[in-house]
Every structure is written in structure tokens, then in C-alpha cells.
Amino acid sequence: MGNFINNAPFALVIVFLIIGFVLLIKGADFFVEGSSSVAKRLHVPSIIIGLTIVAMGTSLPETAVSVSASITGNNELAVSNVVGSNIFNLMVVIGVCAMIVTVNVAKETIKRDIPFSLICAGLLLILGILGVGDKSGMMLGHFDGVIFIGAFAGYIFYMIKIALKASKEGKKVEIEGGSDEDIKLISVPLSILFIVGGAAAIAVGGDITVDAASRIASDLGMSQTLIGLTIVSIGTSLPELVTSIVAARKNEVDMALGNAIGSNVFNILMVLGIASAISPISIITENIIDLCVLIVFTICVWIFAGTRKKIGRIEGFSMVVLYLIYAVYIIIR
């Protein structure tokens, strides 16, 4: 597929990029629906399904792109895809929601989730600079990937533990896709078809997206980092933006910030963990700068959220403006 895309007309490459996005997004939807149905048939608690299968499903497109980019040596794209998605989720998705309706912020998001996401971003920054486990430095190696995956497993275990405890105490536990009503029960053969077909679509979509993005970057004289931070990251995050806008219009965005922060944690620990465990990822100076921007933006949102326990229209507008300023910066740098 790579050779075909490299020799195809530019307009056709754009079409392939869109096809790649569709395969990634719909493949993730089918995979999550099939897996959730099987888990429900096996009597796995809905809370656990919501915290694992459903939550991780939103990061499957980024996983496929970064893993494919890492394997094919497109390291800049592997890292920038994750960092770009995190910045877009945080500043644009939440910012647009807040411009439509005030986003209430849970106490746990302020005291636990945002600080942990900062720790994850800081860990990525430190490991990238030090190149732990690799002589070349400025690299995420196999050992780094193991650290990330281990941290991710610990994070999931902790979240499941506190969610089950809260549920037993009769407290309301709000988790995306974490209720029986959210999980559709479909036949076993159809579930298997969804899982296998979804996984195949994700894998193929990841390869097509990486090949098309690399070709576009080459033809337009753009770096893979810029393509990853803009076109690819925005493309894989569009479903979250559309879903959040619809939810905002229905005034159902109380979980919006918590979901965005959770997705950002998954992107760093799971996506880059798997990608670097499979194949080492080189970290360039631009990646370090973008990570610093992510950390600064996260702190800004933390301040916005912690001040009044909510994010209003002014804060939301400020977040979108900050993203646009950042977008202009990465284009002209």
C-alpha cells in the first residue's frame, strides 16, 4: 500500500488519508462494541468495561497510527500524533464545549486526574530527554515502553479499585460507557465479526494514514511533526469534538473534562508505551517543545477548573485562542 500511495496523484492521496481516518474511527467503534458485548456476556461488571474497553477504545486510532509510524521509522509522526491529539482534546474539545455551555468539573478531576496527567507528560519529557535504556539519548526505547505500560496497568487497576469501592458504598459512579444501558448485547458471531473486523480496519487504517500523511508532508515540504500535530491528530480527534458538541447542546458535559484528561493519560502511557516497546522512537527538539506546551496548557486548564470548579465561556474562548496561537507557531517555526 505504501508504494501505491507514494506513486498516486496528490488528490488521491488526500482521499486515502480520509479513508484511513474512517477505517480508524469506525474500526475502533466496532471493536469496542464487539468486545464490550463479549465482556458483558462473561458477566464482567459494567464499570470495569467502561474503564477499560470503552475508555481505551477512544485511543485506538492514535495507537494504530503511532505503532505503524514507529515500525516504519516515521518517529516524528509517532510522537507528534499523540502530543497533538492531547493538546487538541484539552484545548479545543473542552474549549468549544465550554463556549456552548458551562462545563462543571468533578472534584476528582481537579485533585487526582489532572495532576496525574501532568505526571505522565512530565515522565514522557524526562524519559525522552534522558533516553533511559538507550545509548543514543533523546529516545523512547523498549525499556521506556515497559515503564509506560506498567504505569498504565497500575493506573487502570487503581481506577477500577476506587470505582468498585464507590459503587459498593452506593455512590454514583459516572464513567463513559460504564452502565448497562450503554453496552449493547449482540450475538456472539456478530461480536466476533466486530472484534476481528474492527481490529483489521484499525490496523489497515493506521498504515494508510501514516503512508498518506508522510506523502503529504513530503509533497508540501512539511515536517512529519507538523503533519502529526495538525492533520493527523485533528483527524483522529474529530469524533470526540463532534460528540462533545452534541453533548454540550444537550447540556450533558459534566464528564467532558474528566474524559479528555483520561484520554490524554491513555494516549501517553498506552499509545506511546506500546509503540516504543515494539520499536524505539526517536525524540527531536520540536517534540520536547510541544511537550512543554502540553504541560503549560494542562496547568492553565487546571487553574481554570480549580478556581470555580467549572469552565465557562470566557475560559473556553481563551483555551481555543491559545490553541490557535500555538497552531500558528508550529506552522511558522
Roles of regions detected by a PLM:
Residues M1-R333:
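Hydrophobic alpha-helical segments, chiefly the membrane-spanning helices
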